[in-house]
């Protein structure tokens, strides 16, 4: 089965259905199936999180967002609630697979250079060329509503701006592909993974106390996000310990965890109290719900096989959705259906997001059929 050698790579990037088969040698069949099945569900939640607006303006000005109170709470529940746990699960499983395989450091770095770093560098270039092409077409064909989509901005960047846009350090701190902060942090955490392992082995209690403090207090860590370190550490501890997070989540009843999640979500968005702590607790509750939900996904063989198939394209969807697809689909959608009332706002929220998901997966399938080598390179295979 293809790409079996990459089963220790981050779950968000290059792990394929073949990994489930390989991991059965060490993991239980149930655990490996849960990991394989949940990827595309998590990615769908990530896409919903990234098409979430409380205010929106067309090029040239003019507010077009007129969300209703009901619509606002729907978006808050999905994008700022249920989707909160997706990235934590990705970090946790990525670290778990990395530490569980116990590969040598040189092997890990070699694999990650191909599976994470190469796509991390290539995808911004793909996006720059895409938007330059859109700008060229808009200018030549005089397509006015695309003027605000395409650009040649990268041609004016200084060396410092190139570095800032690729890595997010310096400038405004935002990467050109803003959602690639996940990959950046994963690269850094992979590089320092032996150090984290050593620190944990030497002082377990102190290490756990430190990462909890960093996460819940929101300590500023310049090179990586606090949640990245926290959930990566959770995955490391999971791999090094006897307990199973899936088993832990399975023991929690739905009627126990759902009220906790909803209560924290309501407190956060209604009263805006203790935002860092509340967000962290809510994300962890959502994290456990998603882990628990994976048990449902593997019960039906057809459902499981379908999820594993689409999971092959989860990284492609991740890479292409937030700039390329969102820019085009949202621009065209708002041109046809301006968000002038609550109904059209909700229609945009669900319609654009669903189209982004379908288009991203569809483009991935098409590219894989037309040019498998290019698909593999862009996806770190």
Predicted feature locations:
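Membrane-cytosol interface segments of multi-pass membrane proteins
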Residues: 1-212, 301, 309, 338-381
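Short glycine/serine- and small hydrophobic-enriched flexible loop segments
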Residues: 96-100, 197, 236, 240, ...
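Loop-centered beta-sheet repeat module
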Residues: 192-200, 205-243
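Aromatic-anchored segments of alpha-helical transmembrane domains
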Residues: 44-51, 124-125, 209-222, 258-271, ...
